[in-house]
Amino acid sequence: KIIEESLNLKDVRIFDYVEDEEGRKKPVLNKKETTIAQQKQDLIKAEFDNWIWKNPERREALTRLYNEKFNSIRMREYDGSHLTFPGMNPEIVLRPHQVNAIARILYGGNTLLAHVVGAGKTFEMVAAAQESKRLGLCSKSLFVVPNHLIEQWASDYLTLYPSANILVAYKKDFERENRKKFCARIATGDYDAVIMGHSQFEKLPMSTEHQEMFIRSQINDVINGIQMLKENEGAKFQIKAMERTRKNLQKKLETLLNTEKKDDVITFEELGIDRIFVDEAHYYKNLAAYTKMRNVAGISQTEAQKSSDMFMKCRYLDGITNGRGVIFATGTPVSNSMVELYTMQRYLQYHELERLNLTHFDAWASTFGETVTAVELAPEGTGYRAKTRFAKFHNLPELMGLFREVADIQTSDMLNLPVPKANYRTVAVEASEIQKRIVGELAERAE
C-alpha cells in the first residue's frame, strides 16, 4: 500500500473507522500510525533513488534520456543595443535591461517580464508594441491593465510616444448600450494599441465554437484524470471532486450550446488583436490544476472565471501567432507556491510543455519536485497540524532553464537601481483586548 501511494505521488495516511450516531462508518485519521507510515514512505523513496543509480547501464541510459529531453537547449541572450525606436520621446533614454527586454519580445516568442517593481516594465511593453507594429510583427496590440491604472497607462504611453494612435477604454465604453459600438471601433480602427482594464477584457467573448472546443478539451482532461484514479484505486473523495468538476464543465457546455446566438456580438477573434500585453499578470494565477495529489497547499482544483478566460485567449493567440502573441508582466510571478510557476508556464509555453509531456500537473510535479509533509502552526494560532506542501525541488537548473525560455528575470540585486537606502526596524506591539478576543473566537471555531 505504501509503495502504491508513493508511485501515485500521494503521502500515505492511516485511518481508523468509527461508527457515527446513525451507524455509518466514519474515517478518522490515526496521527501516530500515519507518522510512522510516512517515515517508512521516505525510506522507500530514498532506497529507490539508491537502487536506480546502482546499475551502470541503467544510469547511463536514464542520464542520456534526461539530457536529450531537458538539457538540449542553450539559453539565448538578447541584445537590444542596436534598436533605434523611431517616434520615441527623445528626452527619455531606456536602460540596457529595458532595451534587451524589448529585443526579447521582438525576436523571441511569448514573454514574461518578471522585473522588480520600478524596473520600467511599462515603457518596455509600450516600446515593444510600437516596434512590433512598425516592423510588421503584429497588426494590433491590446494592453490589459488593472482597472484603476487605465488612465495612467494611457498617459505613460503618450509620454513615451507622443504621436501614437491609441484607443483607451473607459468605464462608460463597456456599459451595455456602448459596448457594441466600442468593440466595432477596435475592430475597424488602425490603432497602434488598445488599452483596457482586466474586468473589461473578460467581457470580450470568444466565439461559441472556440469556447465549445476549449470546454470539451477540459472535459476530456478531467475524464482521463478520473480514469487514472479509478485504475489506481484512488480515494473516493478525489474521484467525487473530479466528477463534480466534470459535471460543472458539462453544465457550462450545455448552457453555452443552449444560449441563443446573437449575430450582432463582436467576438474577440473579430477584433483583429494579435498580441496582448498583460500588466500585473499575477492576478490570473488561480488556474485549476487537475491532480491525483491529496489536499496539497497551493494546488487549486477550482479556478476563477477570469483565469479560465485568459487561458482560453492565450491558447487562441498561440494558434494564430505560433506562440508569439502573449506578453505578461509582473513583479511577483511566484508569491505563495511554486505551483504558480507551473501556471505561468501553462499560459506562456503550453506547446513546450506538450512537447515534453508535462502539461499534466502530476507529470510536471514528479519531474521537478515532491510534496513534503511537516508539522506547522495552525492558522488559528493555538495548536499545530500536519500540512502537505509542494516544497521540495530537484532538477532545478533544468526547470529554470525551461522557465527562462519565456521569462526575462530582473531582480533588484541584478539592476542596482538608484533607490534610497532603507533602515528596517522591528517594533513588537502588544495585542489589544479586542484582538485577543477575536483570535480566541477563531480558535474555538477551528476546534
Predicted feature residues:
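Short coil/turn segments at secondary-structure boundaries
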Residues: 18-19, 62-65, 76-84, 116, ...
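Conserved SF1/SF2 helicase motif Ia
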Residues: 116-119, 124-155, 161-165, 320-325
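Charged, low-complexity interaction regions
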Residues: 231-239
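Inter-lobe coupling linker of SF2 helicases/translocases
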Residues: 179-225, 236-237, 244-275, 285, ...
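Conserved helix-turn-beta segment of the N-terminal RecA-like "Helicase ATP-binding" lobe
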Residues: 148-174, 181, 185-188, 348-352
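Conserved pre-motif I regulatory segment
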Residues: 72-114
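Charged, low-complexity intrinsically disordered regions
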Residues: 1-72, 162, 186, 190-194, ...
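Walker B catalytic acidic pair
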Residues: 279-280
